[in-house]
């Protein structure tokens, strides 16, 4: 579904299309580099909150100057994408990043509040959800607003007790990519380790075991906060 060519222009990718291509390419690598005996444990057949690591880590390359300079050129002049434009793209992506982060965290808290109950719920839904996400609430509550009654992700969309995985995937991909940033985004040793310890293993071992084998530690939130401009 990428932008089609016209009579006067070739097919030119938007920034979002580049991100989408890299994302889906990451899923493809997860399948192509799979090296397990059983299909049920191969490639993307992993824990639900681990499946997006190979795809989302690839998206990080989309804002790396050294990567963009390999292909992102003006289709007529051959001029590289200006560094100032790259910076503006990153700044735009990070606009209100802290608020967006809290929004996702609040949805995760609400999801867990519903699915960690041990008794049927009887009471005011609005009051219940306001208590659930109180830890992430920074703006005044909108009167009569009720997220639970329209939260299709957790009631009919397959994310019940798993909405947290959206933000967790960001923590994983940012922390993992920080190793590429430290060693060089084209470092073959780091890439080889990611292939061997993450991509080839599928679901044959616990995700955290595989992650620590690649990263040398458990993930922290620091890399995500730095990437989003929330922390220096």
Locations of regions flagged by a protein language model:
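Cation-handling catalytic/transport regions enriched in His/Asp/Glu
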Residues: 1-232
């Amino acid at each position: 579904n990428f932008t089609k060519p016209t009579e006067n222009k070739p097919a030119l990718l938007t920034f979002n299309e580049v991100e989408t291509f890299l994302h889906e390419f990451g899923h493809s690598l997860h399948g192509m580099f799979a090296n397990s005996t059983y299909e049920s444990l191969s490639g993307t057949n992993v824990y639900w909150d681990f499946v997006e690591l190979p795809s989302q880590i690839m998206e990080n390359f989309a804002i790396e100057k050294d990567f963009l300079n390999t292909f992102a050129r003006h289709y007529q002049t051959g001029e590289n994408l200006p560094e100032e434009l790259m910076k503006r793209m990153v700044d735009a992506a990070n606009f209100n990043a802290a608020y967006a982060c809290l929004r996702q965290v609040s949805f995760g808290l609400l999801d867990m509040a519903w699915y960690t109950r041990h008794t049927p719920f009887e009471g005011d839904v609005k009051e219940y959800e306001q208590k659930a996400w109180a830890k992430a609430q920074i703006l005044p509550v909108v009167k009569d607003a009720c997220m639970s009654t329209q939260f299709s992700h957790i009631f009919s969309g397959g994310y019940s007790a798993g909405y947290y995985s959206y933000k967790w995937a960001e923590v994983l991909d940012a922390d993992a990519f920080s190793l590429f940033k430290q060693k060089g985004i084209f470092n073959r040793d780091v890439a080889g380790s990611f292939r061997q310890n993450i991509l080839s293993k599928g679901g044959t071992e616990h995700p955290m075991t595989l992650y620590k084998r690649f990263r040398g530690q458990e993930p922290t939130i620091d890399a995500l906060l730095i990437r989003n401009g929330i922390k220096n």
